[in-house]
Amino acid sequence: IAADAQQVGQIGGSLAAEILREVLHHQDRARLIVATGASQFATLERLTSEPGIDWARVDAFHLDEYIGLSADHPASFCGYLRDRFVSKVPVGSFHYLDGTRDPAEVVAQATEAFGKGPIDLALIGIGENGHLAFNDPPADFKTSATYHVVQLDEACRMQQVGEGWFGSLDEVPTHALSMTVKAIMASHNIVCSVPDERKAEAVRNTLQKEITPDVPASILREHPHITLVLDSASAKLL
């Protein structure tokens, strides 16, 4: 448990860097899932400034994206990842989810790229409603798909307004492309950064309620190699 959001990012980012360096020491390439949202600002800032990572040997994957948003929209995750990650490090490859293209086509392409090997590290957060990526409650824990099209619930859409990505609920897309819970859980390592008082109830439910699709992030308790990084605000109900 860190003091504040900035420290959450310092811890999460340096741990992610340590894992990537270790993986690259033992194998030719590393495969990384990168998350977005306000919770990841400091984590990505720290990770991209860490020394000793041969980024040319890292293949990175996009976790989720709104359907219908172009990369130049301020709330686009493509734009976020381009500005906060891809433009900062010479990553070997980055597999974007393009929200403007035919969703079925995007899902098929992303699934093929993802399926070429195991994922070494996933950087993720937890939503105010307990979602993982855009898998809102009740989440599908059973699907064997890697990516799918999901409908966003109102709590998830309101969170995006609250974080300042959109001016009103009407502006927030109703559907998105998302990596599935099963695909996230298949990662060898997970670093989950969750700062902010807004997430306190979701954190408590994740750690203390039964493991249930109604609290999608509760499934993380079944992962053997996960580090959950909180700040005093997000941990205040524990």
Placement of each model-derived feature along the sequence:
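Glycine-rich phosphate-binding loop
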Residues: 117-142
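N-terminal glycine-/serine-/threonine-rich phosphate-binding loop
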Residues: 1-32, 104
